[in-house]
Amino acid sequence: CLLSRGLGDVYKRQVARRLGLVAINTALEADIFGNINSTHVSGTRMMNGIGGSGDFTRSAMLSIFTTPSTAKEGKISAFVPMVSHLDHSEHSVKVIITEYGVADLRGKSPIQRARCIIDNCVHPDYKPLLEEYLAMGIKGHTPQNLKCCFAFHEELAASGDMHNVDWSKY
């Protein structure tokens, strides 16, 4: 059964949740903690607008983001240590889907989310790099390492291939 409602109803969170709204949106990149960049390539070049995805994502009973695990013949990973631009925070993102699987992030801590995303969604070529990043993260609730969290983006700009990240430089 398909139910059609006006945007005024959908934008009201309590109405949208009561209707069981499921929001499915596209991600350009996601970080291993579940933050999503839907609009900017490498954080600076706008690829598309955000439209109403923020309202739908925050209001939905279930918010799902889909993305291929890589782009440009595997040289760009859709999953990075930290997104270069933030459109949707981990607080609104419930599920991420790629051709490799589904990461259900509901009720998980940042480290649990990272492991779930790496295990289920990341391209096999990038899993070791992201596992190493997670292991070297600063101890804390969200183990980011600000000295190297943008290494994937820096390597893409320098060599054109995120595979070439070398954590020993950091």
Where are these regions (language model features)?
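Single conserved hydrophobic/aromatic residue that forms the stacking wall/gate
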Residues: 1-7, 11
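Short loop/turn motifs at secondary-structure junctions and domain boundaries
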Residues: 18-21, 87
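Metallocofactor- and cofactor-centric catalytic cores in central/energy metabolism, strongly enriched
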Residues: 14, 29, 33, 42-46, ...
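A short, aliphatic-rich alpha-helical micro-motif
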Residues: 4, 16-18
